[in-house]
């Protein structure tokens, strides 16, 4: 077996998104270094830390730096193997789109779900080996973030918080393995720790499935929980149409990498991709102000540079006052990404055509309108505005600007939204739009 094959086999043996990772997850559960009590605490702490990161954008540039290195590595691979490059980009969500399920990847490339996993695994093996042999990429961003000397618990907590904050649960295990390998952890260590990450994700994905959770595990929904969000809704004129009775998303609705929970309000099981989406569904299910809701109610078609794409907003909800809102889930800083702004424009148009309001729910205390109003130094904003007048800003130029100004990720997102700049990812490029 070649080194590439060993790398690919190790990557693949971290498991398949859910059920198929049972062996890796069970093995991880027997590891004496993380007890069941510590594992449960890790899941809770990661969720809380993820919410804090989603709210503040804390260390967001560090996560962007990681994706920038990955995008450069994938770009080199795509030059020789275009399909591999596209598959890795779609699986990890490097271009700002959400990570895709293996079922969806299989449909995209005309192969089975298992074959999509094999192709991804082979591609990652080739990419990691090439990066380690060439030494051309600065892998210190991984080594600094996931040091080899850290405890299992600390590494798992860090990875889970990042996954939750970036809404990337679908590819959480794959990202964990890849980040650890590039940080210098050996094959078996990376595989084992990725198994821990899978355990935690699978735990919150299946929490409350088929039945109501015990009262001590239910998340209380305050009576006024929806008040600030209803003020952020972009309302439509006219009478709202009825809610659909089934999800518009059908192709990968039952993919093993997705999560499920029982809804008391709907008296059935509901489905979601991420921890953030699960929080939204629980808020809808537990709020007395919400009469009914439907997950993935509509197919939204949008266009990115001539490429037609499809998106399914997280939910539509009818409130007790008769108003209806189409809701999408996007982490706060990510609302400024070009792909998400285009999706939001298309989603708003669709919602208003149905007489529904439109809301981007961020999982933080702030929404898009709050981000637009965020105060950033006028001097710093003018500095970036003047720099963009001379041409696009790439990652290297942005890093110099950040070092001289000290801005954080939410500052950048606020300036992008206010000035209608275009923020592309994978690789990063900031452009002034005429």
Indicate residue ranges for each PLM-predicted region.
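Short amphipathic alpha helix immediately N-terminal
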Residues: 79-99
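Electrostatic, structured charged patches in enzyme active sites and in nucleic-acid/phosphate-binding
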Residues: 193-434
């Amino acid at each position: 077996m070649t080194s590439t094959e060993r790398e690919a086999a190790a990557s693949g043996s971290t498991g398949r998104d859910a059920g198929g990772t049972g062996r890796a997850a069970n093995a991880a559960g027997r590891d004496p270094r993380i007890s069941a009590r510590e594992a449960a605490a890790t899941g809770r702490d990661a969720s809380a830390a993820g919410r804090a990161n989603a709210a503040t954008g804390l260390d967001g540039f560090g996560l962007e730096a990681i994706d920038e290195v990955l995008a450069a590595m994938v770009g080199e691979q795509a030059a020789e193997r275009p399909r591999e490059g596209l598959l890795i980009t779609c699986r990890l969500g490097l271009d700002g789109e959400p990570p895709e399920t293996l079922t969806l990847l299989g449909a995209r490339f005309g192969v089975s779900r298992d074959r999509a996993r094999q192709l991804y695994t082979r591609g990652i093996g080739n990419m990691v080996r090439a990066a380690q042999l060439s030494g051309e990429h600065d892998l210190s961003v991984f080594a600094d973030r996931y040091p080899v000397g850290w405890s299992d618990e600390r590494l798992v907590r860090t990875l889970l918080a990042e996954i939750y904050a970036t809404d990337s649960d679908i590819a959480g295990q794959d990202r964990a393995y890849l980040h650890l390998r590039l940080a210098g952890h050996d094959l078996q260590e990376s595989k084992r720790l990725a198994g821990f990450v899978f355990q935690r994700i699978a735990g919150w994905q299946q929490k409350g499935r088929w039945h109501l959770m015990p009262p001590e595990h239910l998340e209380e929904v305050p009576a006024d929980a929806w008040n600030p969000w209803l003020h952020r809704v972009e309302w439509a004129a006219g009478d709202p149409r009825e809610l659909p009775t089934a999800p518009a998303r059908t192709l990968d609705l039952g993919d093993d990498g997705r999560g499920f929970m029982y809804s008391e309000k709907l008296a059935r099981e509901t489905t979601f991709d991420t921890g953030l989406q699960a929080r939204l569904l629980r808020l809808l299910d537990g709020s007395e102000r919400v009469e009914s809701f439907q997950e993935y109610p509509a197919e939204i078609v949008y266009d990115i540079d001539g490429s037609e794409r499809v998106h399914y907003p997280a939910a539509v909800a009818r409130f007790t006052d008769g108003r209806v809102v189409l809701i999408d889930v996007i982490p706060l800083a990510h609302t400024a990404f070009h792909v998400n702004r285009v999706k939001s424009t298309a989603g708003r148009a669709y919602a208003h055509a149905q007489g529904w309001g439109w809301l981007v729910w961020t999982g933080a205390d702030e929404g898009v309108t709050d981000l637009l109003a965020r105060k950033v130094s006028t001097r710093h904003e003018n500095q970036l505005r003047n720099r963009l007048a001379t041409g696009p800003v790439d990652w290297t130029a942005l890093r110099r600007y950040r070092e001289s100004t000290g801005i954080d990720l939410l500052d950048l997102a606020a300036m992008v939204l206010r000035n209608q700049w275009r923020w592309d990812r994978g690789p990063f490029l900031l452009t002034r739009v005429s």
